[in-house]
């Protein structure tokens, strides 16, 4: 199934993600789109393969999402438009921090990130006219040292859940970040510079 955007202009691409942040970022650069709700495969997030580099892992998961979306698109006989997928992963000491399973997991991740620098890898994959285009942005983020009471209040807000690394830089956790080097929109979940470059390389005009 698909959900049309509220924008009056006809959609120019499919977004294989239900993330409201990714939707907002696409609309921010004038890209009307339709959210393609692709049935998720069984199980949780795709695990990192033994020996697989974090950058390769996030690239693979974005590619898999795009390819599943393309297959679903064809199975539903929907109009053929470019299809965009993305994946974001937080990396600390070479270890992938995915979405927290529960409050204890969120507290564990946030405590590990406190006072330290980590990386956010954001991959985008575009399927268009039988070709796959992909790229990854890598951003370094430093969090200030956080008090246990702050972590508890943050978890009380509900914001950590459903987010890689248990935080969202565009929300309350923005006050935790002391330094960022790279793509702010990549940390949000969709690196706009890389996304626009992929679209242009596929011959799709970007405002």
Swiss-Prot record:
Residues flagged as site, Important for substrate specificity: 21, 88, 170
EC assignment: 3.6.1.9
First-listed, main subcellular location of the protein, grouped into a coarse class: cytoplasm
Subcellular localization: Cytoplasm
GO terms under cellular component: cytoplasm
Keywords per UniProt: Cytoplasm, Hydrolase, Nucleotide metabolism
GO MF terms held by the record: dTTP diphosphatase activity; UTP diphosphatase activity
GO biological process: nucleotide metabolic process
Pfam families from the UniProt entry: Maf
Positions of the catalytic residues: 87 (proton acceptor)
Cofactor(s) in the UniProt record: a divalent metal cation
Reactions catalysed: dTTP + H2O = dTMP + diphosphate + H(+); UTP + H2O = UMP + diphosphate + H(+)
Reported function: Nucleoside triphosphate pyrophosphatase that hydrolyzes dTTP and UTP. May have a dual role in cell division arrest and in preventing the incorporation of modified nucleotides into cellular nucleic acids.
Family annotation (PANTHER family): BIFUNCTIONAL DTTP/UTP PYROPHOSPHATASE/METHYLTRANSFERASE PROTEIN-RELATED, BIFUNCTIONAL DTTP_UTP PYROPHOSPHATASE_METHYLTRANSFERASE PROTEIN-RELATED
Similarity section: Belongs to the Maf family. YhdE subfamily.
Protein name: dTTP/UTP pyrophosphatase
The species this protein was found in: Bordetella pertussis (strain Tohama I / ATCC BAA-589 / NCTC 13251)
């Amino acid at each position: 199934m698909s959900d049309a955007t509220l924008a009056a202009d006809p959609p120019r691409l499919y977004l294989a993600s239900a993330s409201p942040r990714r939707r907002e970022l696409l609309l921010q650069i004038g890209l009307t789109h339709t959210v393609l709700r692709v049935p998720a495969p069984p199980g949780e997030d795709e695990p990192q393969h033994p020996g697989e580099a974090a950058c390769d892992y996030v690239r693979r998961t974005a590619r898999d999402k795009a390819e599943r979306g393309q297959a679903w698109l064809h199975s539903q006989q929907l109009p053929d438009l470019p299809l965009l997928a993305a994946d974001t992963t937080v990396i600390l000491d070479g270890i992938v921090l995915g979405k927290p399973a529960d409050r204890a997991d969120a507290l564990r991740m946030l405590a590990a990130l406190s006072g330290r620098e980590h990386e956010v890898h954001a991959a985008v994959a575009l399927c268009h006219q039988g070709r796959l285009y992909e790229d990854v942005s890598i951003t370094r983020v430093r969090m200030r040292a956080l008090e246990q009471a702050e972590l508890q209040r943050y978890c009380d807000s509900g914001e950590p859940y459903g987010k890689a690394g248990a935080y969202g830089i565009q929300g309350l956790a923005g006050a935790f970040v002391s330094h960022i080097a790279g793509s702010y929109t990549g940390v949000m979940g969709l690196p706009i510079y890389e996304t626009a470059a992929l679209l242009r390389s596929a011959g799709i005009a970007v405002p």
